[in-house]
Each structure stands twice: as structure tokens, then as C-alpha cells.
Amino acid sequence: MALSLPLGPRLGSEPLNHPPGAPREADIVGCTVCPASGEESTSPEQAQTLGQDSLGPPEHFQGGPRGNEPAAHPPRWSTPSSYEDPAGGKHCEHPISGLEVLEAEQNSLHLCLLGLGRRLQDLEQGLGHWALAQSGMVQLQALQVDLRGAAERVEALLAFGEGLAQRSEPRAWAALEQILRALGAYRDSIFRRLWQLQAQLVSYSLVFEEANTLDQDLEVEGDSDWPGPGGVWGPWAPSSLPTSTELEWDPAGDIGGLGPLGQKTARTLGVPCELCGQRGPQGRGQGLEEADTSHSRQDMLESGLGHQKRLARHQRHSLLRKPQDKKRQASPHLQDVRLEGNPGAPDPASRQPLTFLLILFLLFLLLVGAMFLLPASGGPCCSHARIPRTPYLVLSYVNGLPPV
């Protein structure tokens, strides 16, 4: 029986088990008795060749797991058996059936998908570092190519099974369909895991690439931070920063009148202050070499600050002296008054709190007396009117007293 469905795009419109020059009906499903007449019959070698050409797996089936695995090779066919016809003595062959081809290819694909799933599991467990992610991406691409080849083999096997099911018994096709569905579901699960791992690796690669580019940018910036011809700041150096010559010697830390290179300098006193009378250093004298202009500016700044400090100190001293002078001026008069008065009399300053306490005590007594005198001044006539009346209920019996 001929299968009308093609295996895949590579085989074109050629039927499944009919290569060019192969017979259409004979030597496919079962054995036929060859008559004793002079008709041509195929030899065992030709039958085996035709069986492999017609029922062997197509080009899609050749992309299985690489290595020494048996699944990588096309299924091996058993040697066709022959027997002698008692009537004519001619030999007839038993070529392998399409169901056996389908089972062999299904086993091969199952082993291939198991190997791909194991490789995918190893890739999933080996993530976590940039170098591992890079190598994992390369391995994932190779795994994806192998998985696509296996998927094409599964598609070709499903098409072959559908064509075989149209010419087989319903019971045999039910078991075959269940096997093929399980194989397709396993292929789809591997594809889903592959896509998830690919998305994870892409995200890892993006993150690690950004981190690496950031590290490289920082390294380049760190290399470019070394002082160039324009100094540390380069062409953007601000004009207010001191130069290297200004930083060689600090006039404020001058000890013993030494200059920038250990030169002895002389100090000249300036004009005395009008308030404090002290003379501050007006400027630096001339030593072996003249001082720099920045040094004279620093001296002027120091002299101005010193003058302000002396002026503030003089103002504080003057403010402190004024109340002390007032106390000193008032103390002789107080002593004279105390001497003129009676030595046994108390001090008038001590009498003020006593009079205040006495006034408070008298006010308290007045309030207490008013509290006791106000209720008694009203009289007995007014007392009854001020007492509040309590409400009461009067019961009157219309028909007499109630029965006892």
C-alpha cells in the first residue's frame, strides 16, 4: 500500500515509500508468493536496498544526538527473511513494516529529547556569573540548533504516523496516537524551558554588559584623572585657586621671622592704635630678597584682623569698667547714709518684703470675714425663700379609700 502524505518539505511531492524505480504495491506490508513463471523478482540485496530507501527515516531524522549514541543513526533494519515456495522454488522477501519504522524512530527521538533535556538542566543550574552566562549563551545556541533538528524529526514522524494511521487498524492507531502525543508534549515542554532559559540569559547578559561598560568607563575616567599639562583641573582650573609658588610658604606659620627660604626678615611697627595704643605690624621688612606681593597682602590682612580684635577687646573692657565705676561711686554715699542713720534700725531694703507680706495677710483676713458675715446678714425672713422646695406627689381618692 502506498502512503500518499509526504514526510517533509525536503522530500517534495514524492510518496513516502516509493523512491524512483521502486515497486508501488509489492514488498511493503507483507510477503507475496512469487509465481513460478518467468516474471522478474527482486533479489535479497535489492529488496533490502529498496526497503531502506522507501521506509528509512528521511533527512529530518538524521539530526539526533551526536556522539556514539544509537539514536544518532537511522534505525537498523532486520535482515529480510526468505522462504522457498513449495510450488515454484522461488524466494520471497519479508520487508519491515511501517509500524516498526515508526516505533524505532520514536525510541530514537525519545532518547534524543532526553539528552537535550539533560543538557538544558545543566545550563539552568550553571547560571550566576558573567563568564558562566556568556558560555551558557553559546551552549544555549548550540542546544537550540539541536532542538530544532529534533523538532523537525518529530514533525516528520507525526506526519508519517498520520499517513500510516489511515491504512492501519483503529486499535493499533489509538496506541500509536497516544505515543505520538506524549512525544509532542515532551518536545513542547523542552521548547518552553529553552525559551525561559534564553530570556533569563539575555537579561543576565544585558545586566552584566551594563556593569562591564560602567566599570570600563570608570577605569577610563580614573586614568584620565591624572594631572595633565593644565594641572589636576586641566583647562577648567579656577583662577581663585592658589598657585604652587603661593603654597610654598605660609606667612601665618612663620616662626622666628624666617622667610620662605629660611631668610631672616625684620619687622617694622606700624602706627599706634587710637583706642588701645598698641602698635601692630605694618608690614614685612626687606631681607636678603624682597617679599612677594601675596605676602604683603597677607600681612595687610593679618594687621587688619589684629586691629579689629584689639578694638573689640577695648570695647568689652570699656563696657565692663562702666558698671564697676558706678558701683564704686555709689558705695561711698551708701556708707555715709548707713553711718548717719541709727545703727540699731533695720535696713530699708529689708522692710519692703515685710510690708508686702503684711498687706497680703490683711487681704486674706478680709476675705474670710466676708464669707462668714454674708449668710448671717440676710435675716430669717429671707432664709425660707432661699431654701429650694422639693417636689412631692399628692394622691386623692375619688370613690373613697381603697378596700383593705
From Swiss-Prot:
Amino acid composition bias (Basic residues), ranges on this chain: 307-320
Residue ranges of every copy of the KASH domain listed in the record: 347-404
Posttranslational modification: The disulfid bond with SUN1 or SUN2 is required for stability of the respective LINC complex under tensile forces.
PROSITE patterns the record matches: KASH
Bilayer topology annotation: Single-pass type IV membrane protein
Topological domains annotated Perinuclear space: 377-404
Location of the protein in the cell: Nucleus outer membrane
Region Disordered, residue ranges: 1-91, 277-347
Pfam family, one: KASH
Residue stretches of biased makeup (Polar residues): 39-52
GO cellular component: a single term: nuclear outer membrane
Highest taxon of source: Eukaryota
Ranges that cross the membrane: 356-376
Family from the record: Belongs to the nesprin family.
Domain notes: The KASH domain, which contains a transmembrane domain, mediates the nuclear envelope targeting and is involved in the binding to SUN1 and SUN2 through recognition of their SUN domains.
Pathology noted in the entry: Deafness, autosomal recessive, 76: A form of non-syndromic sensorineural deafness, a disorder resulting from damage to the neural receptors of the inner ear, the nerve pathways to the brain, or the area of the brain that receives sound information. DFNB76 affected individuals have onset of progressive high frequency hearing impairment between birth and 6 years of age. The hearing loss is severe at high frequencies by adulthood.
Function: As a component of the LINC (LInker of Nucleoskeleton and Cytoskeleton) complex, involved in the connection between the nuclear lamina and the cytoskeleton. The nucleocytoplasmic interactions established by the LINC complex play an important role in the transmission of mechanical forces across the nuclear envelope and in nuclear movement and positioning. Behaves as a kinesin cargo, providing a functional binding site for kinesin-1 at the nuclear envelope.
Record protein name field: Nesprin-4
